[in-house]
């Protein structure tokens, strides 16, 4: 029994000893493995530093053979391990070395070739100079003549280089211009496509006629007149007629033979009020007889018509703001502006109704601002109010008028519009848009100028599109004659062979003399463009000029930047009298009533 116990004890001790030995061996192997990786890592770093000094693959292999880690008598690793490590480094690093060597060789070759080319060019230039000097000597030229010849030749070289540079710059500028033009065309096409109100030509009349029925017995007839009606309205020594014309600021033409009274005025607002006032006078005469027709009735009818007109204008303005979604807009600081907006309905510009034009411009501006990620509402207000200055007249009607100190004439509607916007404390961007839509400089430094530019574009698109304004045939003929007179000068100088005017004078095709040089062509385009833009009438339109030589080229005049006010069918602005009275927003009262 004791013997068995001893044997078991020896067995356990042996097992423990064996386990201890195994653990020791395992730890030793791990230690060597760790040391191997550390040595490998250290070697790799050393090798990378040395690679920078090595120029070819053979030197790399020799260097690796000399390293202690790759010696065959190393006791820690086998030759197979060393071979694998060596091949690994060679494969990774040799390609890099070869590529660097190749790039270096190519760089050296390029540098050498450049040097050779420069030397050859220098020698060639020197030889040319020598040949020219020799030639000049053989020609027996004086020093000054030779110097002049050389300078002329030098100028020719410079001119050729300059022409080449100009062509390159023109090509780059045209490419950039075409890219911008394409983007702008897309933007404007989208803007016009979103406009719901595209009006046609509207003829604003400067004369209104009241026609009467001459009846003595039938009191039911409307606008009936008695025998003495026309005499009474003219008055003794034409006093009543003169008083009406002075108060209404219109011209009255009485035609008893045709039972008509015509009212004439270039101020369409005054024309509308005078028409309504005269109808009130006639109604009073119909109801009470001609004995009531005196200055008191005339004043009462005039001021009553003024108040009715103000109320109607305010209603139209409020409806306009509601239709555009601006009635509660934060950019409309007061509803009093509604009356001035409504007055635009009774104004015309080149046969285009100003209110309709303003609404259309507002819709275009909104679409443009939407595509540019700007404030659509502000852009819409800017365009709607850009012609608001056309809603007022020259002077105030009474001391109660808000605009009694406004001395701007109606034809300077920009200044008047700025005055209105500043009085009602509109946003500075809106004020500057009103001020700048005809090319003026902005008033406020902090205002955002792109709203003014959008307003100007919207105004132009609405006013200039085909069909919106009436054009007389003699205007087209006059435009053709003006263009022909300008082009004839260049035909006489044999720069232009022939020309053709197309599209009512908006397109001009020119056949250029094939013998002219590039510099002469450039000068022709500049001179012709300047001649067209300096003409008062032609500067109002963008005219495209196509030049035909060996290749086709196209130039467009920038007429819009120099455009003056267009010719109107009637001139409501120029017909303003010095004593013209303003229709202010106050209530009009007759002191005698």
UniProtKB/Swiss-Prot annotation:
GO molecular function, one term: RNA binding
Pfam families: HD
NCBIfam families given in the database record: HDIG (TIGR00277)
Similarity field: Belongs to the RNase Y family.
Top-level taxon of origin: Bacteria
Entry keyword annotation includes Flavoprotein: no
Main localization, broad class: membrane
Enzyme Commission number(s) of this protein: 3.1.-.-
SUPFAM superfamilies according to UniProt: Eukaryotic type KH-domain (KH-domain type I), HD-domain/PDEase-like
Record-annotated membrane-spanning stretches: 6-26
Protein name: Ribonuclease Y
GO biological process: mRNA catabolic process
Subcellular localization(s) per the UniProt record: Cell membrane
Main function: Endoribonuclease that initiates mRNA decay.
Matches recorded under InterPro entries: Diverse_Catalytic_Enzymes (IPR051094), HD/PDEase_dom (IPR003607), HD_domain (IPR006674), HDIG_dom (IPR006675), KH_dom (IPR004087), KH_dom_type_1_sf (IPR036612), Ribonuclease_Y (IPR017705)
């Amino acid at each position: 029994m004791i013997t068995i116990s001893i044997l078991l004890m020896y067995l356990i001790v042996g097992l423990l000893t064996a386990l201890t030995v195994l653990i020791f061996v395992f730890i030793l192997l791990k230690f060597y493995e760790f040391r191997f990786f550390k040595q490998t890592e250290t070697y790799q770093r050393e090798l990378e530093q040395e690679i920078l000094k090595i120029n070819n693959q053979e030197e790399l292999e020799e260097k690796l053979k000399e390293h202690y880690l790759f010696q065959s008598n190393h006791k820690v690793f086998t030759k197979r391990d060393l071979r694998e490590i060596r091949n690994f480094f060679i494969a990774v690093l040799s390609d890099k070395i070869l590529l660097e060597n190749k790039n270096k060789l190519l760089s050296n070759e390029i540098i050498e070739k450049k040097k050779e080319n420069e030397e050859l060019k220098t020698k060639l230039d020197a030889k040319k100079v020598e040949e020219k000097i020799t030639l000049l000597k053989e020609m027996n030229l004086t020093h000054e003549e030779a110097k002049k010849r050389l300078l002329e030749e030098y100028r020719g070289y410079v001119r050729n280089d300059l022409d080449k540079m100009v062509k390159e710059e023109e090509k780059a500028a045209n490419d950039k211009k075409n890219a911008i033009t394409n983007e702008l065309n897309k933007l404007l096409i989208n803007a016009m496509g979103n406009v719901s109100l595209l009006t046609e030509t509207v003829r604003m009349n400067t004369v209104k006629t009241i026609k009467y029925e001459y009846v003595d017995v039938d009191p039911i007839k409307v606008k009936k007149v008695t025998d003495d009606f026309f005499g009474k309205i003219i008055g003794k020594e034409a006093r009543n007629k003169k008083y009406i014309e002075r108060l209404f600021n219109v011209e009255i033409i009485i035609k008893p033979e045709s039972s008509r009274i015509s009212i004439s005025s270039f101020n369409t607002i005054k024309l509308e009020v005078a028409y309504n006032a005269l109808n009130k006078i006639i109604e009073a005469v119909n109801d009470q007889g001609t004995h009531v027709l005196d200055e008191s009735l005339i004043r009462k009818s005039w001021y009553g018509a003024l108040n009715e007109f103000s109320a109607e204008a305010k209603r139209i303005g409020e409806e306009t703001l509601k239709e555009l979604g601006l009635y509660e807009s934060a950019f409309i600081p007061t509803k009093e502006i509604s009356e001035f907006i409504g007055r635009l309905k009774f104004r015309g510009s080149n046969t285009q109704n100003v209110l309709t034009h303003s609404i259309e411009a507002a819709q275009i501006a909104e679409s443009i601002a939407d595509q540019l990620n700007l404030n659509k509402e502000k852009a819409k207000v800017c365009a709607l109010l850009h012609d608001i200055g056309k809603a007022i007249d020259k002077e105030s009607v009474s001391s109660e008028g808000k605009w009694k100190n406004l001395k701007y004439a109606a034809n300077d509607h920009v200044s008047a519009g700025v005055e209105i916007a500043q009085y009602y404390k509109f946003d500075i961007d809106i004020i500057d848009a009103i001020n700048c839509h005809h090319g003026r400089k902005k008033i406020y430094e902090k205002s955002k100028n792109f709203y003014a530019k959008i307003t100007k574009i919207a105004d132009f698109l609405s006013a200039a599109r085909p069909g919106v304004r009436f054009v007389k045939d003699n205007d087209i003929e006059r435009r053709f004659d003006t263009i022909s007179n300008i082009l004839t000068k260049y035909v006489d100088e044999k720069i232009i062979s022939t020309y053709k005017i197309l599209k009512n004078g908006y397109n001009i095709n020119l056949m250029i003399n094939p013998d002219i040089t590039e510099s002469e062509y450039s000068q022709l385009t500049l001179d012709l463009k300047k001649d067209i833009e300096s003409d008062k009438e032609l500067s109002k339109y963008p005219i495209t000029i196509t030049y035909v030589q060996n290749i086709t080229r196209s130039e467009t005049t920038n007429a819009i930047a120099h455009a003056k006010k267009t010719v109107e069918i009637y001139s409501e602005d120029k017909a303003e009298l010095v004593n013209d009275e303003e229709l202010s927003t106050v209530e009009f009262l007759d002191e005698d009533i």
